[in-house]
C-alpha cells in the first residue's frame, strides 16, 4: 500500500529467514516454514488456512481491537509492535527451533480453531439469506 511502513523494515532478520515482499501468496503459503503478516486482511484467513505457523505483528498502522487481540494471542504467535522490545520478541520467534515452534503451534490449535470460527469464517447463520428474507417481507411505504 502506498505510504505503508512495514515493521520489518527496521528489523535485521536472522540468516535463516528469507523475506518475500510480494509473494504469490496462494501458492507460497504452503511451502513456508513460518508466515509473518502485519495486517488483518484476507491474508490472515489465507495464512490460517495453510496451518503453517503464523507470526502476526500488531502494528500501530493497523492495530487489532483489544478483544480480538486477546483471543489472537492464544491462537498464533503475536508480536506487539507497540512494545519497546517487539523486535527482540520477533527475533525470538524467527530464531526458534522448527520442532519447538511446531509443538507450540499445535498446542494453540484449539484456540486457533475457535478464533477462525469466530473471526475468519464469521457467523454460522446465513446473513445474506436473512437480509433477502427481510427485504422480501418488508411492506412498501
Name the predicted role of every residue range.
Residues 20-22, 40, 127:
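Amphipathic coiled-coil/heptad-repeat helices and related helical stalk/stem segments
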Residues 4-16, 34, 39-123:
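Catalytic binding pocket for nucleotide-activated donors in carbohydrate/polymer assembly enzymes
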Residues 22-32:
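Short acidic alpha-helix that forms the nucleotide-activated donor recognition element
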